[in-house]
Amino acid sequence: MAVRASEISRVYEAYPEKKATLYFLVLGFLALIVGSLFGPFQALNYGNVDAYPLLKRLLPFVQSYYQGLTLHGVLNAIVFTQLFAQAIMVYLPARELNMRPNMGLMWLSWWMAFIGLVVAALPLLANEATVLYTFYPPLKGHWAFYLGASVFVLSTWVSIYIVLDLWRRWKAANPGKVTPLVTYMAVVFWLMWFLASLGLVLEAVLFLLPWSFGLVEGVDPLVARTLFWWTGHPIVYFWLLPAYAIIYTILPKQAGGKLVSDPMARLAFLLFLLLSTPVGFHHQFADPGIDPTWKMIHSVLTLFVAVPSLMTAFTVAASLEFAGRLRGGRGLFGWIRALPWDNPAFVAPVLGLLGFIPGGAGGIVNASFTLDYVVHNTAWVPGHFHLQVASLVTLTAMGSLYWLLPNLTGKPISDAQRRLGLAVVWLWFLGMMIMAVGLHWAGLLNVPRRAYIAQVPDAYPHAAVPMVFNVLAGIVLLVALLLFIYGLFSVLLSRERKPELAEAPLPFAEVISGPEDRRLVLAMDRIGFWFAVAAILVVLAYGPTLVQLFGHLNPVPGWRLW
């Protein structure tokens, strides 16, 4: 064992980013686990079952449904997704380029995220920041929540610099060459997030922090909401694109095939850079004070964002068909049966993609200026984003552990652990699909979101059937979560090591249609130009409205309703 440990230490000396990536992953999945433990209580609430009295006995610090909902949303939708992105979208390009990232900055970003998380968590646990994950003013939390959250989010700016520095060094050593695919995805992803995160940074610096410190009397809720949704919608793609990077560059290899088109993958990511951010007003269709013309423009741009996802569906499906036919699949659908359905690293993202199809269709409804009024602020909305982040993103992250943990730690995954992983991803998928049906159905029956409806059990008798779906989903997902916890820690705490696993290259897929000698690829590789175009689009989409809103500020004092 000592020999094995020394060999692993040697691997970490050669590739120190492995240990930092592992720290990001473990912290992220711990956040997912803790946040998800509150999930069944939310599901039971939407099944008209009030389980919060039981939760208060188990966890006395939980004072209300809304505190549990805040913890669930913050830990799952913000903390887990960000830490997973900081792990994947730094480690993958570093390994593709075979270059060492700036380790001082990588550890700085981890410590910023960790300290920010701890500082923000303390008021959350003390019921001093029960403001939900959207933290809309005039709901006012403790200053430590806003300060910790700001430090946590700003840690991503360090990650941005790390990847841009990797790319710059590679370009300097390889003049005239096209950026490799994974690195291209990472650079575009982080530039997209920089533009997107500016809204949240402005909200925190200009309003939330001075307000919570008592330096100003109040905040204009409409301005704060507008700045939040500047970030709040593109954060969906901050969740999504690390999963897409895995689906494009790792999944075809797991399936036994190749990626059919490198240029299509690049174009999809480039479109996300251009179109992800100037779309936030579709979350504010019901808000006064914003010109309907701008709402319509954002609605149209939101519909355009569906295009790169449709391109992804085509490219990935073609890649999987190629893999299935290489594995002996015949006939119209025989290739599907031939795919490796015994491999959780393959099954998890594929099931996530299947769930993403109705999730994307629901997103078209949300983006519509007229249809959104039917489902706005109903249970339909959490039904939609559970198909996005809780299905595709989370399942892809879970599946990635089966090739990533051995590469980071040298710890093998046994056949029994893989079988357990299959059970987890199928149960998780089943639970999310049942929940999606229940929440979408309840939303169409005007059951509201963000509501403690179990306290008024007679209010929605017409929604009794979809409520049964939500209860069933909560039970299935709890079983899946407990099995996942057992499986994850059985690997992390294992003493068996095989250093050759940690020394092996990542399973990047080969491509059929590559980037060589293509004018489109050369044009897309002018990333600085496209970033400037994206920035101009953001200024055009938000500038006129923000100028108007900042010229007519209406600050109101903070409220505490919990």
UniProtKB/Swiss-Prot annotation:
It catalyses: 4 Fe(II)-[cytochrome c] + O2 + 8 H(+)(in) = 4 Fe(III)-[cytochrome c] + 2 H2O + 4 H(+)(out). GO terms for molecular function: cytochrome-c oxidase activity; heme binding; metal ion binding. GO terms for biological process: oxidative phosphorylation. It holds the Pfam family COX1. Pathway: Energy metabolism; oxidative phosphorylation. There is a cross-link at residues 233-237 (1'-histidyl-3'-tyrosine (His-Tyr)). It is an enzyme of class 7 (translocase). Cu cation binds at residues 233, 237, 282-283. This is Cytochrome c oxidase subunit 1. It comes from Thermus thermophilus (strain ATCC 27634 / DSM 579 / HB8).
